[in-house]
């Protein structure tokens, strides 16, 4: 049974360390910039998934994001959002076609009305997903290696699949820009597709997308570059990375 230690059991904190930490945090409420966007403070709400029907924004989502913005954070990261309709399911929000833009607009407006920014997080789940929306379409991954979480064995992506994916991300990012988002973030962590390419556990490829760390990072970097060409030099494009394979 876990027992919380009493205060007497905790090592004393040096006053020098305590006040040094406070001095480092004093800028939390200061205005700053992240690329082209202005942050009214240093508080950023991390991405948490939203469960919705058919990938469309719900009224409950709009209410939640507005409440988060009213709470005072400078920037909110959306829940992960799919760029490929074949990965649709499990209530994940979507931006793989223009039909989703109108649903995002009132959510964006509600966040902006509270003087906050909103970034759309984009993802491809790869074999980190249980089943494709179209059963005739295979799950895609870096290599045909069983997924530790789902047990599914994906089809190793061809160069055509890779080019298609990069374009899907670029098109979704442009939709985000046109909808009014302040930027996008590529989800390259937590066992999803970009992460599957970056780790040697899943990536057993012998082509330009496998082997060295530079090669395993190539898909993420090239996707960023493809997005950048589509959205222009000033639109923020962030990347969420993971430092370990777990």
Regions found by a protein language model. Give the residues of each.
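Active-site glycine- and acidic-residue-rich loops that bind
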Residues: 53-56, 166-167, 175, 209-222, ...
